[in-house]
């Protein structure tokens, strides 16, 4: 009886191993892309508009020695899987209202490519931008910033700009800002100017 039971289990094991199950092959590149996207999302998960500098220091986004600078660098430099050389924050009354990703890129096509990589990420999340501009290398003037795309989403504005520098170098910027804080800041400035008059 034990021999028959053993043979039946062995036969089932052999049949199970030889069945035509479809194996799921996940390409390694998609795993890498997913990992970098998840990593980038996690990096900014706790960063919120209106945070003060102490909160950002405690969460590790900025360092204490950088808070004395006019432009405060941020430690995370990616939007999705697109990495920038520099990222900085802007504050008003010690409250976060903007994050600026910027890079000095060689070559017009490389500059535009970087901006459109970011645009595609935001397209997937927010749909088509509210404003789109097509520029050519010849149409860009030195030290004049051109907006390539712009979203106004509830209380957030996302803007991608390019600026021609000397020779074949370009400044590329992606600005994400809280429009409520920006609006309050602008209103305060307007009120102050009108008071002077």
Predicted regions and their residues:
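Positively charged n-region of N-terminal signal peptides that target proteins for export
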Residues: 1-4
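Sec-dependent N-terminal signal peptides
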Residues: 6-9
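C-terminal motif of bacterial Sec signal peptides marking the signal peptidase cleavage site
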Residues: 14-16
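Compositionally biased P/S/T/G-rich terminal and signal peptide-adjacent segments
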Residues: 22-33, 73-95
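Non-cytosolic coordination micro-motifs
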Residues: 22-67, 104-197
């Amino acid at each position: 009886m034990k021999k028959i039971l053993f043979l039946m289990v062995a036969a089932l094991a052999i049949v199970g191993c030889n069945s035509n199950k479809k194996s799921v092959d996940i390409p390694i590149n998609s795993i890498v892309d997913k990992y970098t996207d998840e990593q980038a999302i996690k990096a900014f998960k706790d960063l919120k508009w209106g945070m003060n500098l102490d909160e950002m220091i405690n969460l590790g986004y900025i360092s204490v020695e950088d808070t004395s600078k006019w432009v405060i660098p941020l430690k995370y430099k990616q939007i999705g899987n697109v990495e920038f050389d520099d990222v900085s924050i802007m504050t008003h009354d010690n409250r976060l209202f903007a994050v600026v990703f910027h890079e000095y890129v060689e070559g017009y096509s490389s500059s535009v490519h970087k901006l459109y990589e970011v645009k595609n990420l935001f397209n997937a999340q927010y749909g088509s931008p509210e404003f789109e501009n097509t520029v050519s290398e010849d149409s860009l003037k030195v030290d004049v910033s051109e907006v390539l795309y712009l979203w106004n989403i509830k209380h957030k504005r996302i803007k991608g700009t390019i600026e021609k520098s000397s020779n074949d170098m370009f400044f590329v910027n992606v600005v994400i800002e809280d429009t409520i804080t920006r609006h309050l800041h602008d209103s305060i400035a307007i009120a102050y100017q009108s008071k002077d008059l």
